[in-house]
Amino acid sequence: MKAMIFAAGKGTRLKPITNTIPKALVKVNGIPMLQRVIQKLIQSGVDEIILNVHHFANHIIKFLKENDHFGIRIEISHEENGLLDTGGGLKKASWFFKDNKPFILHNVDILSDIDLAKMIEYHQHKNALATLAVRERESSRYFLFNDQNRLCGWQNVKTGEIINHNPFHKIKKLAFSGIHIIHPEIFNYCPGLTKFSIVKTYLDLSQDHPIMAFPHNQGYWYDIGKPDNLKEANAFFNNS
């Protein structure tokens, strides 16, 4: 199976650590977050990975070479001319997914014990265009889903902005966990190679294509792109 890791971010929230290293190589209990994500993907059956790079890209490439690419095929998608956001970054790497099989998209700063094999099985059972790992937790932004767990909107709590394609039915708000399963068909509906958000694409497609929720409320989940969460994750893995 194939996967993509979003690893191009500048890690602004983790400064001053990221003044000298890329966010992807920030360590959690002595192990770089990139290594933790790669190893989780391998344990879930992934044997081919592409990751996008930008900030201190050479550090990441050197790290992968020093670790013999963890024994699998790992390709690099360079965003040297500027970050392309989630949608643009994914679209630039679309050549990697020409086999027309579902793949995992995973943020480098997300650590969890989510069962990716079950998520893939769920995605295939629902014949979804994309499946989003979501969680009941406090957030400033939520995806909105109907009672069939199908995406129907989005809400920004801070600004009050709401997009709701299903206004007359009961909806549930769930926070995104930074992990997707995607069918390559989605590239047919994406803009050209430009900067854009995959969230907007999901919302635009959700009325005509199944974009599904995969709730995972048990176990651990950390967004370690934030200093407090990084500290908490260090303590958790130190005691594990």
Model-predicted segments: where are they?
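N-terminal nucleotide-binding beta1-loop-alpha1 segment
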Residues: 1-19, 44
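Conserved N-terminal catalytic core of the sugar/cofactor nucleotidyltransferase
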Residues: 2-5, 31-107, 118, 192-193
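Generic preference for hydrophobic
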Residues: 3, 25, 76-77, 130, ...
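Short catalytic helix/loop segments, enriched in acidic residues and glycine
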Residues: 20-33
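Catalytic-core segments of class I nucleotidyltransferases/pyrophosphorylases
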Residues: 103-104, 111, 117-124, 137-138, ...
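A short, conserved acidic/glycine-rich loop-to-beta-strand motif
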Residues: 126-136
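Short beta-strand-to-turn element immediately C-terminal to the catalytic PLP-Schiff-base lysine
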Residues: 144-146
